[in-house]
Amino acid sequence: MVTTLILLGIFSQIRNLLLVIFDVEGVLLDEEYLPILAEKLNKEDEIWEITKQGIQGKINWEEGLITRVAALKGLDEKICQEVADNLPIMTGAKEACRILKASGWKIMAVSGGFTLMMDRLQKELDLDYVYCNDLIFNNGKLEGVKINVDSDKSKPAKIKIAEWGEKKEDIVCVVDGANDIKLFDICELGIAYRAQDLVKDLATTTLEEKDLSKILNIINKHFNLKLETTV
């Protein structure tokens, strides 16, 4: 009996080390930020085309980001913040994060997006850590971008993974774009969520239903767990 309790305690500790890494736009958020911001300057078609090419891996992601932000130069900082504050959270994201956190999981978000949208998201979803880029403002006007997260999102993620002592076999990644695929190198379970074909080809499994809480079923099956699931 004592041996059984000890083993159960060890198993519980191991399970508590599990980590989910999410992409943000198109995964935790149900919109792409810059194309919506571009509507303020009637440049949504131009910005969305560059965004799509970056997501699909057809252009250099960093250059595409710099080009998109440059096209929006001069936008008022208050407008940028207002748009960020009103980005819709993905269906099922709150439920998924709530259940994961209640079960002892850590949650990280790695985004090519920006601090002014990630601060809000971190609070609302109780994320343990976020990595993202920063928009640069000068006298209240959009000036440029500071790139902290490039096309290899695994680089910043590895820093916190090492700090937390996470193991690859205990990590899940949920992503949708070509600029996310290197995250699959550092995880046990890679989920392509409503993703580009390139991402689907490299993922462990895919989820097409627009409900992020359905990843819980996938996680349960893969790790033989019994996390709470939604109907």
Predicted regions and their residues:
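Short, basic/polar N-terminal leader/transit segment immediately after the initiator methionine
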Residues: 3-4, 19-22, 214
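Alpha-helical substrate-recognition element adjacent to the catalytic core
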Residues: 14-134
